[in-house]
Amino acid sequence: MNEFRERYMSRPTTLLELLAVGLDAEPAIGAPGSTDLTHAGLRSAVAETAAALRAGGLTPADRVAIILPNGPEMAVVFLAVASTATAAPLNPGYKPEEVEFYLTDLGARALIVHDGGDSPAAEVARRLGVAVLPLRPTPEVGAGRFVLDTRALAGPPSDGLPGADDTALVLHTSGTTSRPKIVPLSQRNLAASAANIRASLALTKADRGLNIMPLFHIHGLIAAVLAPLSAGGSVVCTQGFNALRFFGQMEAARPTWYTAVPTMHQAILGRARQNAAVIAACPLRFIRSSSASLPPQVLAELEAAFGAPVVEAYGMTEAAHQMACNPLPPGARKPGSVGLAAGPRVAILDDAGEVAAPGAIGEIVIRGDNVTAGYENNPKANAEAFTNGWFR
């Protein structure tokens, strides 16, 4: 096991390899009011769930939609599904017609929902012929543990494990100006992005994150969950962001860092002064901000309030989240800047689609192990998005 762990600590290519890094007895998944799930316990939960899904006939190519509240169960289910099939987490706030669109567009074979009676999402899934798999949390066993009812799956059993280039996760783009595009991300994409973030933030097994990000979004899934686990560290999964509860959660979890979007940081900052004692008792190593530009004044006020550096990063779904990141001290951080290339290769293309000379003005493009191979069933979008192997 030690040789296996050392081999993949620097660059795993699948989620199972990534999850092999953590030491057995060290914490992996936590939750307010629950006993931590160790890395050995996490691997066991992932293996048990994956085996049940394969016994029901699911293959790496099968899409499993997940509609669950934020929390440790959502994190573990995502890891289990993505380790054996293709995970498709959806917003629990979707209306029935939205659920129908996404289940149909994805070609979902199964839907995992909370075991609490017939939810509208479950009713939609059954009408579409999608197997509904109810999940019952068992927090008394440990954070993130659950019982999953897979009887609706119809076999025959599958024994295939995904390879590095098999799809692990599918997410939709926002679709604010057009039909949402499906972004498939491979095992390699996810593992590479987690490793990139781990390196940018110098994460180790001593680091403990506090997740307040939604786990149907690339930011929360990769930066908040996968990155710390890839370092053998841990993440405490809250039920979602609530500024009134944040400092209580921080005091209970005693994290070394958290990642959030600017609006969350601003809400946290608004309550920082009255929670100065918690901040002093629970010092953070750094704070991470991504998914939108953080106003320089907010960055400065956060650093003053927490006595910790704020690291801005730039990401997008097609890059499995992170593309660029400001360095930790003593590196120079520039407020309002996306920072330095942090994983993928970044270049500037000229009007002819060739890499431009230093100092030239052009279009920013990226390529690397974390970048999607292309949108699903959308040749027009792919032709527009890719130039000579670069993603625009």
Regions found by a protein language model. Give the residues of each.
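Conserved AMP-binding/adenylate-forming core of the ANL superfamily
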Residues: 7, 27-71, 75-79, 95-100, ...
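Conserved pre-ATP/AMP-binding loop-to-beta segment of ANL
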Residues: 25, 139-141, 145-146, 153-172, ...
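Conserved AMP-binding A3 loop
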Residues: 36-40, 168-192
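Structural core segment of the AMP-binding/adenylate-forming
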Residues: 55-56, 85-161
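Short beta-strand->loop structural element characteristic of the AMP-binding/adenylate-forming
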Residues: 65-67, 74, 78, 82-112, ...
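Conserved AMP-binding/adenylation subdomain of ANL enzymes
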Residues: 82, 191-208, 218-256, 267, ...
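Gly/Ser/Thr-rich phosphate-binding loop
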Residues: 255-260, 269-333, 345-347, 352
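Conserved ATP-binding/catalytic segment of the ANL
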Residues: 341, 357-359, 365-392
